[in-house]
């Protein structure tokens, strides 16, 4: 089954937790999960959370891009909120008991791991949709993703102006 997958987390979350304690980290992670749920509306589903990371699924790249754009605006508008980073991929996966499995999910996670605070990285199918919708896209070339056989072409998707986000949470 085809779907669009996205992993989003907070840049500097480990440093924040180390400096301000586990309770502060848990509070921020819960706040971010609630912010994410609100931003999704009907454009996607919050599949899971782990620490500060959220795993999202949507029917199409277009719907995922809308949801991520809303999440970005919310994070950027929140004073002293850490910078958000994301990776998005569209492809085939298996849905069982409300959970997604497969290489496409793994690719989205690996792409997210390469993103720095304030940036959205995506693979070619998502970037193509972003371009058709007038969203600025910058090619980054082909990269090798850990434990993924094929090199993937990555793109930076310009969703928001990351200047409003706090990058160093300590």
Show the residue positions of the predicted features.
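Juxtamembrane helix-loop transition sites at the ends of transmembrane segments
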Residues: 30-33, 42, 113, 140, ...
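Catalytic beta-strand-to-alpha-helix segment of the class III nucleotidyl cyclase homology domain
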Residues: 55-164
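Short, charged, solvent-exposed linker or helix-capping segments at domain edges/interfaces
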Residues: 164-170
């Amino acid at each position: 089954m085809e779907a669009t997958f996205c992993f989003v987390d907070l840049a500097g979350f480990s440093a924040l937790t180390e400096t301000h304690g586990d309770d502060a980290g848990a509070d921020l992670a819960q706040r971010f999960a609630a912010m994410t749920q609100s931003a999704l509306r009907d454009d996607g589903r919050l599949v899971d959370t782990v620490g500060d990371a959220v795993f999202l699924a949507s029917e199409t790249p277009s719907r995922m891009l809308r949801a991520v754009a809303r999440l970005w605006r919310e994070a950027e508008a929140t004073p002293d909120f850490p910078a958000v980073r994301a990776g998005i991929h569209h492809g085939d996966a298996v849905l069982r008991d409300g959970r997604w499995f497969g290489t496409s999910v793994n690719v989205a996670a690996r792409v997210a791991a390469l993103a720095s605070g304030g940036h959205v990285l995506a693979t070619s199918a998502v970037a193509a949709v972003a371009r058709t919708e007038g969203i600025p896209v910058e090619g980054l070339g082909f990269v090798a993703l850990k434990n993924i056989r094929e090199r993937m072409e990555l793109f930076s998707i310009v969703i928001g102006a990351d200047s409003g986000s706090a990058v160093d949470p300590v």
